[in-house]
Swiss-Prot record:
Membrane topology classification: Multi-pass membrane protein
Compartment(s): Cell membrane
Stored PANTHER family: TRANSMEMBRANE PROTEIN 256 (PTHR43461:SF1)
Family indicated by similarity: Belongs to the UPF0382 family.
Organism whose genome encodes this protein: Haemophilus influenzae (strain ATCC 51907 / DSM 11121 / KW20 / Rd)
Range of residues in the leader sequence: none
Transmembrane portions of the chain: 6-26, 70-90, 95-115
Protein name as catalogued: UPF0382 membrane protein HI_1073
UniProt keyword annotation of Membrane present: yes
Keywords from the named record: Cell membrane, Membrane, Transmembrane, Transmembrane helix
Amino acid sequence: MKNKYLTLVALSGFFCVALGAFAAHGLSHILEAKALSWIDTGLEYQMFHTIAVLAVALSALRDNKFARLSMSSWLIGILLFSGSLYALAFEASNVIVWITPIGGTLFLIGWISLAYGSFKSKSL
């Protein structure tokens, strides 16, 4: 796999669009408004960070260790933050709610890591 980040963002984008379509057309009559709101929030953050990983993966910074930390943090953050919101929407145990802020923290780590990596980069 030459660029694993491109493969992962392609899959993330696919699942984001698929779940969004399923939520809009198949779940809107089944789930309560609160559950649909959790799905919408998860989708919003998933797509936003998928695009962020894509941008960094295609940039000159992609081989910078802090940029790689950013992309990894965002991808794991998607799994934890968005994934926990999806699970809550489908009535998973409320214990999973404690995973959501860990994913959000990983999003923040990714952004500050990218800022630091770009600041310290001599090639930009």
